[in-house]
From Swiss-Prot:
Residues that bind ATP: G115, N116, T117, S118, C119, G120, K121, T122
Protein function: Involved in the homologous recombination repair (HRR) pathway of double-stranded DNA breaks arising during DNA replication or induced by DNA-damaging agents.
Keywords tagged on the record: ATP-binding, DNA damage, DNA recombination, DNA repair, DNA-binding, Nucleotide-binding, Nucleus
Location(s) in or outside the cell: Nucleus
PROSITE patterns assigned to the protein according to its UniProt record, in alphabetical order: RECA_2
SUPFAM superfamilies in the record: P-loop containing nucleoside triphosphate hydrolases
InterPro entries, alphabetized: DNA_recomb/repair_Rad51_C (IPR013632), HRR_RAD51_Paralog (IPR051988), P-loop_NTPase (IPR027417), Rad51D_C (IPR047323), RecA_ATP-bd (IPR020588)
Gene Ontology molecular function: ATP binding; ATP-dependent activity, acting on DNA; ATP-dependent DNA damage sensor activity; DNA binding; single-stranded DNA binding
Name the record gives this protein: Probable DNA repair protein RAD51 homolog 4
CDD domains linked: Rad51D
GO cellular component: microtubule organizing center; nucleus; Rad51B-Rad51C-Rad51D-XRCC2 complex; replication fork
Domain of life: Eukaryota
Family that this chain belongs to: Belongs to the RecA family. RAD51 subfamily.
């Protein structure tokens, strides 16, 4: 028996929270098994044939159009929009900001940290999340695929990078006795700051690609409501959202791609398109970590293949090696970028002070 050919445009491949299993069955049983049939058919005709509410049909068509449509824009107008709406955010790491053009992260762009296991991708992600929360009072969504997010480690980085500097300034201005009297009050202030920083970072545990797709869809739908100026109490967090961290994309997508897993490849493409759409439409920074695989020349390269390599605007490679039995040296450089020079290397220390 010949294997049935798959085009990747079957409705079932694009099942989401809106396009539920029940709706998929109704589409398939009433002559709409393919995406193009849904997009090019009249919404009221679909409603009559499938008995799906017209509001749901319209919403499904709109979401599918976001994935498959390409609207041309004027180049000069695009330049003006970019110049007006782009915002820069420091990563909290001075040399990393210099590596990224001198201004740190740029809103609406996708950054990918690539490296072997235990090379420091999660540490940099937490450090950048910490700085955006502490310096800009921004909200961050941290999507964790391996329970790597560690609040105690975040507090340790906070104390090392910020509180030590503040105490040094206080010691220069105050006498030792006055500093000892105020130590208890300072500890309380420090604890309040840490709690506020942690409160602005929302962590989601995610262990498969479908959950990731649903999370991104929720972010998109919530931000679209806010952009229409209809905020609710639950959406206040998203109003101040500036960064989404995905740690790690390789863990989520690697099991579903490769070989004859056609559906997995299209799921990856759906996720990549949604990430690009959210980043560009709502000017959200995406910081994504990825694993490495062996290249042809015994050099490591980013996992997930060439199709995924076109997703990030900037790809940063992290290397680490042992100089002797005790010392481990890590370095980071830009492997690929749409606008930044590559191959500039600098060293990382224990507390990510470059």
């Amino acid at each position: 028996m010949e294997e049935e050919s798959i085009s990747g445009l079957e409705v079932r491949f694009y099942q989401t929270q809106c396009l539920s299993e029940d709706n998929v069955i109704k589409f398939e049983n009433n002559g709409y098994p393919m995406i193009d049939l849904i997009l090019f058919s009249d919404a009221y005709q679909i409603q009559r044939n499938t008995s799906i509410p017209i509001e749901t049909v319209t919403l499904i068509q709109r979401n599918l159009q976001r994935l498959f449509s390409s609207v041309p824009i004027n180049g000069y107008q695009h330049y003006l929009d970019v110049k007006e709406f782009k915002t820069h955010y420091s990563s909290g790491i001075k040399l990393l900001d210099q590596l990224l053009g001198g201004n740190g992260f740029t809103s609406g762009e996708i950054y990918e940290l690539v490296g072997n296991t235990s090379c420091g991708k999660t540490q940099i992600s937490m450090c950048c999340s910490l700085n955006l929360s502490q310096q800009y009072n921004s909200n961050i969504i941290y999507i964790d695929s391996s329970n790597s997010f560690s609040p105690p480690r975040l507090i340790e980085i906070f104390k090392s990078n910020y509180l030590i500097k503040q105490r040094q300034k206080q010691q220069q201005k105050q006498q030792q006795k006055q500093h000892q009297k105020q130590q208890e009050n300072n500890d309380k202030i420090e604890q309040d700051k840490i709690l506020k920083i942690l409160d602005r970072i929302k962590v989601f545990n995610c262990f498969d690609s479908i959950t990731l797709l649903e999370l991104l869809s929720t972010i998109d739908s919530t931000l679209s409501i806010i952009s229409d100026e209809i905020p609710t109490f639950e959406n206040q967090f998203y109003k101040g959202l500036k960064m989404v961290v995905i740690d790690s994309i390789g863990t989520l997508l690697a099991p579903i791609i490769g070989g004859k897993q056609t559906q997995g490849h299209y799921t990856m493409m759906m996720i990549s398109r949604l990430i690009k759409y959210i980043a560009d439409t709502y000017q959200i920074i995406f910081l994504i970590t990825n694993n490495t695989v062996g290249g042809n020349s015994f050099d490591n390269k980013a996992a997930l293949g060439e199709a995924w390599s076109m997703v990030p605007n900037h790809q940063l490679m992290i290397n680490h090696q042992y100089n002797d039995d005790e010392n481990e040296e890590r370095s980071i450089y830009i492997e690929k970028s749409t606008r930044l020079p590559v191959s500039i290397i600098f060293i990382i220390n224990l507390y990510w002070l470059f």
